Amino acid sequence: MNEPTTVLTDYALAAVSIFLGSKLVGTSKLWAVAFLALGLGAVLGGTWHGFCDNDALWKATTLSVGVASFGMVAGSALATTSGALQRLLIGFALGKMAAYCAWMLYHDDFIWVIADTGSALLIVALLHLWRFNGWMLAGVAVSVLAGLAQASGFALHERFNQNDLYHVLQTAAMFLLYRGVKR
């Protein structure tokens, strides 16, 4: 196994995301899509980091995260808006996902995953600031903190790197986002 801690923390993020996502299927299908797609991305990412760093697996990982971003934006639009604005935002989320997925078929750099997720988190934050939901805003804040920790390259230990820290922080963010969706 190449990166055992990264595999374990990625799989833990996957387990939490899939568990919480399955609990959302009956109440918020779009947020369930976000959680389940992120869970799939974490399973694939953990497998890529630990066992098999092939291109197809990486593509599937990045595309899963794009689907998760769609679910976050569309789910937030459904929860906070109505009418024409809601249709516009969901259409935007679909277009954003299609453009991202098309781009990622030919690009591998993680910066594009960050850009897509970051823009989704910004939209989610704005929507839940407008229709105030403190749990969602806390989840977005912890997600941003997780991304910054990952980008920093900071490692708590030689066997606990920035990816591992990201996974742990993002797992906490998933609980906050779940609480916000269930509110």
How does the language model describe each region?
Residues 1-39, 45-61, 66-183:
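Polytopic alpha-helical membrane-helix bundles and their juxtamembrane interface segments
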